[in-house]
Design a protein with these regions (language model features):
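Conserved non-cysteine loop/helix-boundary elements of the Radical SAM core domain that shape
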Residues: 171-372
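Amphipathic beta-strand/beta-sheet edge segments enriched in Tyr/Trp
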Residues: 7-60
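Short, small-residue-biased leader/transition segments that mark boundaries at the very start
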Residues: 2-5
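N-terminal [4Fe-4S]-dependent radical SAM core
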Residues: 82-85, 105-106, 110-153
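A C-terminal junction/extension of Radical SAM enzymes
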Residues: 347-424
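Canonical Radical SAM [4Fe-4S] cluster-binding loop centered on the CxxxCxxC motif
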Residues: 148-183
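C-terminal accessory region of radical SAM enzymes
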Residues: 364-393, 422, 428-475
């Protein structure tokens, strides 16, 4: 039926607050939009006596396009009215490099890709350049991966020495579950057996043991788990085997030796910051020196691909604190550095007990990110993957930097969503990527998740396996 739409945005800017009212009046009750529909947006921003108006015209046959045009109009008006802009413009998704990658795969050159990202999302020049550069490096790395006949494996170890204030991942204090770790490994091995049998005809391209903190396991338990994986899967096509050692207070010589003798090619030693006061605030029960000594021990034992995670926007951290952290990291010369922007989720202690942290400053800016990028460049590291999350400090991003030949393949695969990832363990989420593309070039993705609670995972392991069976038996 005939329908006309009139969207009116009223935005009153008072002090530092913006109130938005968006009403849509539709005649005919039809939710679809008709061809050749003219839409007039009368948009008023009142700020210090000024009024800013805009009118746009769209072909309403494409709902997604119409939504994007409305977002652009609203964003542009708010930008004019407040004098403020966002580094990523209207982009709110977590994988901006997927857009740049799609442009490259469609044959666009750098200029055409830049113009598309600028015109479609109003992203800043810095973020567009970052996205294009990373997408090109990702494409070169992913050319080695067989999407259709390959897959990757994630193993979750949901235990930590303690829970960090910002963390919302599936993790539990080891002290509470110490007597059930072997039971957990029993259940995990059962899920590994199913996966190995189901995917025996596929190429295993990468393995990632994460958590939690995998090195909360004892040396014997680490050896047991990795030997189980090596005995269960054909690793001849495996490009990378990562164990996220993570917390320096969980790392010992014996554990590193267990990893080394089993051929682990990549590990993480994650300080998050090199400021001791911040470590104490966020509940990481280790010292700056623990990080330094753990890293040096790993180097001494021959690990030549070590990542270090850092977080921008932690409580009470200044730009000078970040500079101090990067100076110490530079002295260690890791092969990978991952710069995270603090993203506090509902389940994190920073949210649950927010009154305790309400007086603490948590700031991340483009200046912070640029400083980290400059230090990484000095270390010979280039950005190779990027992702975003809701509620990120400064509306920034997470960026992985790596030396030549040391980029994390699994990190790229999980962000680009081009290959199936089978995930085992409590709270692990399996992602099936269908090989036949949709008309728009994207791929259908289906998921199944394991229960998060360790006790439930142990007792319901058969059900977890059945979930995977249903996911992969669908034709």
């Amino acid at each position: 039926s005939e329908m006309c739409i009139r969207d009116r945005f009223k935005i009153d800017y008072v002090g530092d607050e913006i109130a938005v009212e968006w009403t849509v009046n539709r005649a005919g009750g039809n939710n679809s939009m008709t061809d050749e529909m003219q839409q007039a947006d009368e948009s008023d921003i009142k700020t210090a006596g000024k009024s800013i108006c805009t009118k746009i015209s769209v072909d309403g046959t494409d709902r997604k396009e119409t939504k994007n045009r409305l977002k652009l109009a609203l964003y542009s008006m708010i930008e004019k009215g407040t004098g403020k802009s966002l580094p990523w413009g209207t982009l709110s998704g977590i994988r901006p490099t997927k857009i740049a990658m799609k442009c490259i795969e469609d044959g666009m050159n750098d200029k055409e890709t830049y113009d598309y990202l600028k015109e479609t999302y109003l992203a800043s020049d810095e973020k567009i350049d970052l996205s294009i550069g990373i997408a090109k490096r990702e494409k070169a790395l992913l050319d080695k991966v067989d999407y259709d006949n390959g897959y990757s494996l994630y193993i979750g170890i949901p235990f930590c020495p303690s829970t960090c204030a910002y963390c919302s991942f599936t993790s539990y204090p080891l002290g509470v579950w110490k007597n059930r770790v072997d039971d957990y490994l029993d259940a995990l091995e059962k899920e590994i057996d199913y996966t190995a049998q189901k995917f025996y005809h596929k190429k295993l391209n990468s393995i990632y043991i994460g958590g939690g903190t995998p090195t909360t396991l004892s040396p014997a338990q680490l050896d047991r788990l990795i030997r189980k994986i090596k005995c269960s899967f054909d690793l001849k096509d495996c490009l990378e085997f990562t164990v996220e050692a993570g917390r320096p207070d969980s790392i010992t010589r014996e554990k590193l030796l267990a990893l080394k003798k089993n051929g682990i090619s990549r590990i993480s030693v994650n300080p998050q910051t090199m400021k001791q006061q911040t470590l104490d605030i966020i509940g990481r029960h280790h010292t700056v020196d623990d990080t330094i000594q753990s890293f040096k021990l790993a180097r001494e034992l021959g690990f030549d691909n070590i990542n270090m995670d850092l977080i921008m926007g932690l409580p009470e951290e200044t730009l000078d604190d970040v500079r101090h952290t990067m100076e110490l990291v530079k002295e260690l010369a890791p092969d990978n550095v991952t710069i995270h922007s603090l993203a506090v989720k509902r389940a994190a202690r920073l949210t649950i007990f927010k009154d305790r942290y309400s007086d603490m400053q948590m700031v991340n800016t483009q200046e912070h990110m640029d400083l980290c990028a400059a230090y990484c460049k000095q270390m010979g590291l280039e950005p190779y993957y990027l992702y975003r999350q809701k509620g990120m400090a400064g509306n920034m991003e997470n960026v992985g930097y790596a030396a030549k030949g040391k980029a994390g393949v699994y990190n790229i695969l999980i962000m680009e969503e081009k290959q199936t990832i089978v995930a085992c363990g409590a709270g692990a989420s399996t992602k099936r990527v269908w090989p036949v593309p949709n008309p728009d070039g994207t791929h259908r993705i289906d998921r199944c998740e394991n229960v998060k609670d360790v006790g439930q995972y142990i007792t319901r392991i058969d059900e977890m396996i059945e979930r995977k069976q249903r996911l992969f038996e669908e034709k």
